[in-house]
Amino acid sequence: MSVFKGEVTTLPPDKSISHRAALIGALAEGVTEITNFSGGFDNQSTLGVLGACGIPLTQEEVPGPWGGTIRRVVIESKGLWSFRPSGAPLECNNSGSTMRMMAGILAGQPFGSELVGDGSLMKRPMQRVAGPLRDMGAGVELSESGTAPMRIAGTKELRPIVYRLPVPSAQVKSLVAFAALHAEGESRIIEPVLSRDHTELMLGLEASEVDGERVIVVPGRRRIEARPFLVPADPSAACFIVALALLAPGSEIMIRDVCLNPTRAAFLDIMIAAGGQITIENRRTVGGEDIGDILARGGGVLEPLSISDPGVVARVIDEIPMLAVLSVFASGSFEVSNAGELRTKECDRLNALAVNLQRLGCLCEESPDGMRVSGGVRAQHSPVVVECFDDHRIAMSFAIAARATGMDIELSDSAVVGVSFPNFFALLESLEV
């Protein structure tokens, strides 16, 4: 069994903040400079779509604070209506974030657009995107199955909206907010369950609690002034490295400058409550976001994880694949409910976990919004081939388990990690003692 030690200063920049910084930069008046922008495939898809819509932008490598280089993106825009027709379908590749949030912006532009993606993205449901945009006055056409291609007939006459999110979704919340920026009047977005709040923080939107629900106020046609953004390290990426340390006794890894926004760092609370040896150091606030360093040590006894609270599930939705694999390998069992959103990600992640954990000898029982895993890992064959289902988080979750435990696991598609974590395998190599 391997041991992993070291300091991580090359974690990918936060994917969610990178998307939003680029989109807000394209809506702002002036020059927006984004330091430490993500080089992952999804974030590059967002830049590609902005460029195709006529938004001037540049991207270059500059020296990083810990050595090496980081990515700086500069976007120049004249405000909300700086977008131009592309003349061709806008290629989002595998990025659901790009497709959904761009739909909100394009709904407010006075021209038609078409959003497309790769085979995986074209199967993902988009009805929740279409509904509020149609209510605001935009035309939205989907396939008969409610998926992309998404054809949008934008308009400068969008109506304000009062929209209650039916399920927690930061992407749907964000696309409604981006559309509402173009509307004539004030819109309100109601969240019964809090989801990640980067969009409202970065736009400076007013949010308050009313009768136990969160209400976000979006003023229409407000001038957005360009400002610089510094993107911290991605907590969803940090989750994999923390799990690596926890699964490998004797390991000790320090991860620098990680986003610790409360809507993103709940996975740490779950791991600590289960017995994980994790401490947070150098906590501070930069650009409205909590940032800190995470120290994770292996060797402790981890209790089985059971996640059911809807608010908690919403805050760890991207980390559930890694939490599931961590719990099964460390304790033999795992349980989650109220997580139906996982079935609409890059793949049906609940089913993907069940398929692969069964290949490892686990007993898995799926429900519409969750799963129960028991029996522990007891693979009968070697190597065990893990089907990645074109999903970076499924691939990385099982890759971490293989590295930490020494189990002979083969990924069906290791290249898919480049969607969010291009240096994933190189980083694992550098940490192994």
From Swiss-Prot:
Enzyme class: transferase
Alphabetical UniProt keywords: Amino-acid biosynthesis, Aromatic amino acid biosynthesis, Cytoplasm, Transferase
One Pfam family, short name: EPSP_synthase
Record-listed phosphoenolpyruvate binding positions: 15, 96, 124, 171, 349, 393
Entry keyword Amino-acid biosynthesis: yes
Reactions catalysed according to its record: 3-phosphoshikimate + phosphoenolpyruvate = 5-O-(1-carboxyvinyl)-3-phosphoshikimate + phosphate
EC id: 2.5.1.19
An individual GO BP term: amino acid biosynthetic process
Major localization class: cytoplasm
Binding site for 3-phosphoshikimate: 15-16, 20, 169, 171, 318, 345
GO cellular component, one term: cytoplasm
Record-level Gene Ontology MF annotations: 3-phosphoshikimate 1-carboxyvinyltransferase activity
Annotated catalytic residues: 318
InterPro entries referenced in this protein's UniProt entry, alphabetically: Enolpyruvate_Tfrase_dom (IPR001986), Enolpyruvate_Tfrase_sf (IPR036968), EPSP_synthase (IPR006264), EPSP_synthase_CS (IPR023193), RNA3'P_cycl/enolpyr_Trfase_a/b (IPR013792)
Domain of life: Bacteria
Pathway(s) where this gene product acts: Metabolic intermediate biosynthesis; chorismate biosynthesis; chorismate from D-erythrose 4-phosphate and phosphoenolpyruvate: step 6/7
Localization in the cell: Cytoplasm
The family this protein is said to belong to: Belongs to the EPSP synthase family.
Assembly information from the UniProt record: Monomer.
Function statement: Catalyzes the transfer of the enolpyruvyl moiety of phosphoenolpyruvate (PEP) to the 5-hydroxyl of shikimate-3-phosphate (S3P) to produce enolpyruvyl shikimate-3-phosphate and inorganic phosphate.
Name of this protein: 3-phosphoshikimate 1-carboxyvinyltransferase
Lineage: Bacteria, Pseudomonadati, Chlorobiota, Chlorobiia, Chlorobiales
